[in-house]
């Protein structure tokens, strides 16, 4: 089992296929322990509705002030992820946005090995991945106030599924 990997997540401004990526996040694990973090807002002109803003915890103003271009954000993201196996929580969802973005901006698609937790959970538990289910089913505990906890839980779930 590999204990060195990167848990990745993208955030979009909606769930439909026309939605845009508004952030990239990644948490690197080495020897099964989180060691490095990456986060970048994207300022591509995508608009967040009030309801999406409430769910995500950031606003259009946040994207405009702190976001970088899609190209810069993605290059930083793939640089951070280079050399590591990637763990996703919902690969089917994330991949369609990443692939479309790569086509639109003429950027390279990630070539890392990818493992999808949603698929792993469906095979083992007959239901998809969720942070709460992973915590309860696998007995994972984290600091409730840590904004990175959802990536930490995903990494620990990946490790736990390979041990059991």
What are these regions (language model features)?
Residues 1-107, 111, 132-142:
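Conserved non-catalytic scaffold segment of RNase H-like nuclease domains
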Residues 69, 130-131, 150-153:
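Generic hydrophobic secondary-structure packing signal
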């Amino acid at each position: 089992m590999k204990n060195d990997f990167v848990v990745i997540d993208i955030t979009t401004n909606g769930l439909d296929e026309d939605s845009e990526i508004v952030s990239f996040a990644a948490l690197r694990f080495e020897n099964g322990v989180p060691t490095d973090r990456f986060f970048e807002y994207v300022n591509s002109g995508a608009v967040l509705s009030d309801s999406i803003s409430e769910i995500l915890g950031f606003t259009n103003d946040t994207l405009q002030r702190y976001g970088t271009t899609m190209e810069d954000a993605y290059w930083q993201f793939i640089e951070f992820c280079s050399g590591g196996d990637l763990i996703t929580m919902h690969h089917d969802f994330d991949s369609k946005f990443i692939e479309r973005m790569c086509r639109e901006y003429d950027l390279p698609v990630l070539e890392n090995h990818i493992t999808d937790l949603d698929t792993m959970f469906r095979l083992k538990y007959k239901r998809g991945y969720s942070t709460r289910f992973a915590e309860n089913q696998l007995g994972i505990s984290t600091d409730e106030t840590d904004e990175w906890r959802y990536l930490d839980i995903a990494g620990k779930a990946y490790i736990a599924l390979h041990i059991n």
